[in-house]
């Protein structure tokens, strides 16, 4: 009975986490829609908000060892589950030249930074700061490539904007679907919704981390294992659903922008910000399983980028 209660709290907390991220991101994008780089930053942060909130809640609750499993697990799931399901559904999933030449190296570079930062067993403040700076550089780079001067929250899920700013925009479109359709109609309402989203995010993340620890205790297993597996699968579900909707519209080229940029943002931003609050221990499980799996996933995806397509058979192999 205790396990059921913890799992119920965990499920409700994750749902609230996504809702809070939608509200906060919609409000932030409304206030920052005049500047392309600032707007892209808001979109990128919005895409990583669930993982970022969970990571900060883990650090502030005295469980920094959960941060890297959260990041690694969600990143591995984002690559294997999202790409696998998308390729299997699309039969042949194309990878456009921009992804292969710009976004694939971006992901590989992000993975290299994380690997070397975690090599000594702890990710320190200075390494976290480096990751945040790298994230900002990525934002400016992708914003410059998109050549977007201004946009509104509604433009975030509009086809024309997606085509121009695929790198960061599609990760939010995939995660939150049409969540921005209900954005605030005026500044006051946007501010209130943003504040409510921030509060909901904070509370949901705290309850999710506590429920994760409680469920792990009830099952007599390590919380790190649940963070790497259950959180990973849960985090990948919205991306899978969003990617399948994109494939149904036959806009196959947008899926890979979701995966490449979304995973890079997740690695740099979430790990970097969390490390600036507290040193992040890598842990035996993360070092022996998480990092090698993550490196293999990134390497496989990068190699697939050179072939410019992922076949249905490769998709099933990913799964």
Residue ranges, per PLM feature:
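Hydrophobic alpha-helical segments, chiefly the membrane-spanning helices
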Residues: 1-319
């Amino acid at each position: 009975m205790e396990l059921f209660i913890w799992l119920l709290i965990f499920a409700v907390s994750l749902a609230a986490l996504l809702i809070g991220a939608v509200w906060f991101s919609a409000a932030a994008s409304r206030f920052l829609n005049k500047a392309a780089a600032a707007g892209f930053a808001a979109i990128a942060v919005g895409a990583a908000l669930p993982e970022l909130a969970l990571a900060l809640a883990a650090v502030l609750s005295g469980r920094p060892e959960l941060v890297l499993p959260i990041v690694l697990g969600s990143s591995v799931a984002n690559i294997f589950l999202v790409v696998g399901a998308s390729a299997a559904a699309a039969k042949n999933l194309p990878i456009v030249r921009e992804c292969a030449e710009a976004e694939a190296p971006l992901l590989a570079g992000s993975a290299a930074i994380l690997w070397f930062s975690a090599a000594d067993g702890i990710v320190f403040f200075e390494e976290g700061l480096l990751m945040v700076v790298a994230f900002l550089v990525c934002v400016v780079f992708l914003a410059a490539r998109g050549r977007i001067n201004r946009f509104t929250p509604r433009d975030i899920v509009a086809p024309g904007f997606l085509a121009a700013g695929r790198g960061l925009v599609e990760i939010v479109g995939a995660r939150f679907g049409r969540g921005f359709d209900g954005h605030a109609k005026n500044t006051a309402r946007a501010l209130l919704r943003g504040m409510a989203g921030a509060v909901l995010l904070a509370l949901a993340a705290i309850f999710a981390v506590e429920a994760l620890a409680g469920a792990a205790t009830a099952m007599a297993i390590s919380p790190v294992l649940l963070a790497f597996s259950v959180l990973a699968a849960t985090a990948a579900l919205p991306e899978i659903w969003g990617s399948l909707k994109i494939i149904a519209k036959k806009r196959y080229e947008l899926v890979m922008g979701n995966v490449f940029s979304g995973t890079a943002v997740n690695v740099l931003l979430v790990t970097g910000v969390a490390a600036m609050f507290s040193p992040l221990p890598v842990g035996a499980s993360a070092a022996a399983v998480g990092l090698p799996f993550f490196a293999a996933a990134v390497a496989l995806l990068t190699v697939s980028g050179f072939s410019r397509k992922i076949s249905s058979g490769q998709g099933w192999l990913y799964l």
